[in-house]
């Protein structure tokens, strides 16, 4: 059964699933689509054509789907935000709607954990199982692969791509693309090592060893793109292939490797 506080504003046309809770002074726009068992806490605002998946929670004063901070945006453009299942969006986080420069939607996958005061700008594409620590700031068109963790107080430049399974240390600043399964740190961020903690959580020892050998082959000496091409030959590991293809397809470049001895 839905629980809607009398002071909440639910515009006519909004679609609310089963057992949705909307607390005091929250606002849900007419084009919003809210899944089952979603909790929208006090003062949160769900705007524009925004979809929020089942079992998600939007905490107090978070704003999801407000217009993008883009001077070329025309308000008559159809835009919104799409968020998957089991999302947690903490206090004062802001997630802007997309623009015509993308497909009109900012997109976030399942199981996102977005901590307080984070900002996700227009047209960002975030995969599944993303964690953004407090005050992480994503500019427009940023892409984060599945299982990426971004530390607190970290800004990411527009159009940067961060590959699957990366760890970005807190108080870093990214202006270039980060290869899948890597740990990056610093201002400006450099690649420091394989993300051993993240890879060990997800893969068996043999696959972690393959990724570790691939990392050393790619980064320790020689030209990065030539190393990636050579490593792709007769490569059986799909995850190593992801690393190589990412390097060969980067648009913003890969930052300088400043490694740790145990990478």
UniProtKB/Swiss-Prot annotation:
UniProt keyword Repeat present: yes
E.C. numbers: 2.3.1.129
GO cellular component terms listed in the entry, alphabetical order: cytoplasm; membrane
NCBIfam families xrefs: lipid_A_lpxA, PRK05289.1
Coiled coil start-end: none
Predominant place of localization: cytoplasm
Function: Involved in the biosynthesis of lipid A, a phosphorylated glycolipid that anchors the lipopolysaccharide to the outer membrane of the cell.
Localization of this protein: Cytoplasm
Oligomer status and interactors: Homotrimer.
Reaction equation(s) it catalyzes: a (3R)-hydroxyacyl-[ACP] + UDP-N-acetyl-alpha-D-glucosamine = a UDP-3-O-[(3R)-3-hydroxyacyl]-N-acetyl-alpha-D-glucosamine + holo-[ACP]
Database matches in PROSITE patterns: HEXAPEP_TRANSFERASES
Record's protein name: Acyl-[acyl-carrier-protein]--UDP-N-acetylglucosamine O-acyltransferase
Family the entry assigns: Belongs to the transferase hexapeptide repeat family. LpxA subfamily.
Gene Ontology molecular function: any one: acyl-[acyl-carrier-protein]-UDP-N-acetylglucosamine O-acyltransferase activity
Keywords, comma-separated and alphabetical: Acyltransferase, Cytoplasm, Lipid A biosynthesis, Lipid biosynthesis, Lipid metabolism, Repeat, Transferase
Pathway: Glycolipid biosynthesis; lipid IV(A) biosynthesis; lipid IV(A) from (3R)-3-hydroxytetradecanoyl-[acyl-carrier-protein] and UDP-N-acetyl-alpha-D-glucosamine: step 1/6
One Pfam family hit: Acetyltransf_11
GO BP annotations listed: lipid A biosynthetic process
Gene3D superfamilies documented for this protein: Hexapeptide repeat proteins, Udp N-acetylglucosamine O-acyltransferase, C-terminal domain
Tagged with keyword Methyltransferase: no
